[in-house]
Amino acid sequence: NNVIAKPAEDTSIIGCEVVKIFHESGVPKSALKLVLGDKKIGNELTKNPLIAGVAFTGSSFAAKQINKNLADSNGPIKSLIAETGGQNAMIVDSSSLKEQVIDDVIRSAFLSAGQRCSALRVLYVQDEIADEYWDYLNEALQEYTIGDPNLPKVDIGPIINKNSKDRLLAHISALKKSAKRTIKHHHKQDKGDLFITPIVFEIDSINQIDEENFGPILHFI
């Protein structure tokens, strides 16, 4: 079977590099092809009768559209494997090593500005140690540097585009009204238009999060 890879339009360079690695490792170019473009290209691929199935990672909205396209296309029934709208979580109890846990939490939640499907979104902490971990998380987060990710000693970069930033700011605005307390990175707001300050919200329930937030936002429960 042949595979066509289509990365998100804003991550075309990464898509090219990943496919290049596969080709260099011995996968025939005829077996793995790369297509770049926006949602028009995605719609064409998922509606094409020659496509037997789709594997997709992204938003629930996009997955629903892909599923509809596959169902409406001509030919036999086609398969869809989708990973969407995830809220990756970590559970911390009193047996955990605080320094190691907090380092792992910050790296998972905030490196790449949280723009990874595997990024940590929710941190569950045992009640008895919640205040201790909250204070240590606040202290440790301030040690990370925000700026141009191409520069040395910079840990956290910008959001990929304005639409993503606007969605994140809307989520932050809503949570500010209901969060019990907040941790915010203390960097100056002069880095550029697409930077969002890493932020941690303590919330009462996972039900306060109604969608995946693809950015530097961590929810502490």
Question: How would you label these PLM feature ranges?
Answer:
Residues 1-29, 99, 216:
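Conserved small-residue-rich beta-alpha loop and adjacent elements
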Residues 6, 35-37, 57:
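Structural motif
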Residues 21-26, 47-48, 53, 60-206:
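ALDH superfamily catalytic-core signature
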Residues 33-37, 92, 220-221:
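Short acidic-hydrophobic, aromatic-tinged amphipathic segments that line or gate anion-handling sites
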Residues 192-197, 211-218:
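Conserved glycine-rich beta-strand-loop-beta hairpin in the small C-terminal domain of fold type I
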